[in-house]
Regions:
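Non-catalytic, solvent-exposed interaction/assembly segments
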Residues: 1-130
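Conserved nucleotide-binding/hydrolysis micro-motifs of P-loop NTPases
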Residues: 27-29, 102-103, 146-147, 156-157, ...
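Short helix/loop capping segments that flank catalytic or ligand/cofactor-binding pockets
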Residues: 31-32, 105-107, 148-151, 159-161
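Short, solvent-exposed amphipathic alpha-helical segments in soluble enzyme
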Residues: 38-39, 112-113, 154-158, 166
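Noncatalytic linker/hinge segments flanking ATPase motor cores
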Residues: 61-66, 134-141, 180-181
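Long, charge-dense
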Residues: 120, 125, 158-181
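Gly/Thr-rich phosphate-binding beta-strand-loop-beta motif of the actin/hexokinase/Hsp70
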Residues: 133-158
Length: 181
């Protein structure tokens, strides 16, 4: 769900009388997403208060609020399969961008602080890190007794990568020269 360059450019250039940007940390574990939905409900309330304080049209406020409430709660019975599927597949954070006639979400691999901003354009600065920095790294762990290649992603434990013909220890990796501890 990380936005593509064209999506990012559309967000960057979008303007409206009232654009709502919401960021919230989320959990990958399905049992904990109920807490995330509660946070979204609170952020929705804050967004509505900011929209009303900014003098937004009542219909625009209702449109934005309806989309946010539906995302947090699902349909009237609370069992919309698409919403349940959405919450079952989260990343580290969720970015939501809403304005009259527009609503989009992006699941992000980096952890962001909960916030709401209402302006004449979307607040995308927190989103930029997700599209700017790589979220994986390779580590060559070299010791006297072992050599390992590890892949580290944005979440979860490092994973050892098996490489054929990788030296077995520091002595082999140094070209059979003396290795001091």
């Amino acid at each position: 769900d990380i936005p593509t360059r064209p999506e990012l450019e559309r967000l960057l250039t979008a303007t409206a009388d009232h654009c709502v940007s919401i960021y919230l940390p989320t959990h990958r574990v399905t049992q904990e997403t109920h807490q995330d939905r509660l946070v979204l409900r609170d952020l929705t309330r804050q967004a509505v208060e900011q929209l009303e304080a900014a003098g937004a049209d009542a219909d625009a406020v209702a449109d934005i609020e309806a989309n946010l409430v539906h995302l947090a709660e699902g349909d009237d019975e609370g069992d919309d399969p698409a919403v349940e599927e959405f919450w079952a597949n989260q990343a580290e954070s969720l970015a939501i961008f809403a304005s009259p006639g527009r609503f989009e979400t992006h699941r992000l691999p980096n952890h962001l602080t909960a916030m709401v901003e209402v302006s004449d354009r979307f607040h995308i600065t927190p989103l930029l890190r997700a599209v700017t920095f790589p979220h994986a790294a390779w580590i060559l762990a070299l010791s006297q007794g072992a050599v390992r290649l590890l892949e580290v992603g944005p979440s979860g434990a490092p994973v050892e990568v098996r490489v054929e013909d990788l030296p077995k220890d520091a002595w082999q990796s140094s070209g059979n020269k003396v290795v001091r501890a």
